[in-house]
Each structure stands twice: as C-alpha cells, then as structure tokens.
C-alpha cells in the first residue's frame, strides 16, 4: 500500500505525528503523481477513527482490487484527505510520477512547544 496525501502540508503533519521529540526526520523526498481516474478512484464516506477498523477496511479494499486509489479522511484533519494507492492494481502502471525532490522540515516544527492551544 502506498500512502499519500492531497497536499504536501498534510503529508508533513501525517509524518510528524509519528516522530517523537528526540527524533529528527532526515533525508526525506517527495514527489507528485497523476493518478488515472479510470478505473474509478474510490471515495470513502464513512468514519473510521480507531486504528484496527481502519486497518481492516484498508486491507479489504486493497484485496478487492475494485479501484486503484481511495480517498480517506485524515484522522488529524478530517476535512482533508489522504490517498491510499494500491500498487498491485493493474492501473498502477499508468500513474505518472514527477522526479523526487528533497524536502527539509522547518526546524521550528521539530522543537518542543510550550504553547497552549
């Protein structure tokens, strides 16, 4: 399964929630892709907030091979979407990739914060 986001900023947040304060994400690259809309890109319209039900749904969708990609709401920002892309789907070969580009995190994102939201 290939995990992607509809925006680079969301991809950054999705990564940062998994980085502890003593870790520093290094050597990251990003790319953009054009995903063919046929066969249909699936759009998930449910709510899966717990990790286990989300995992089961994703595994079932991937095994079904009904679509190349599925848009799913971000748990961090539910109004925005992540995209799961199934690399074993026949249409995966039709995805057009840009050249990878270096991504550097702004150091302010990686320091501890005492701000109260």
List PLM regions with ranges:
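Active-site and NAD+-binding cores of ADP-ribose-processing enzymes
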Residues: 23-117
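Extended catalytic/binding region for NAD+/ADP-ribose chemistry, centered on the ART fold
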Residues: 1-14, 18, 84-88
């Amino acid at each position: 399964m290939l995990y992607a986001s509809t925006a680079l900023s969301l991809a950054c947040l999705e990564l940062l929630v998994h980085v502890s304060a003593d870790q520093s994400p290094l050597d990251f690259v990003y790319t953009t892709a054009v995903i063919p809309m046929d066969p249909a890109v699936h759009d998930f319209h449910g709510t899966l907030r717990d990790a286990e039900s989300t995992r089961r749904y994703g595994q079932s969708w991937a095994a079904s091979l009904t679509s190349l990609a599925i848009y799913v709401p971000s748990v961090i920002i539910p109004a925005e979407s992540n995209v799961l892309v199934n690399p074993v789907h026949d249409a995966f070969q039709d995805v057009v990739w840009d050249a990878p580009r270096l991504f550097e995190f702004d150091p302010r994102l990686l320091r501890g914060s005492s701000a109260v939201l």
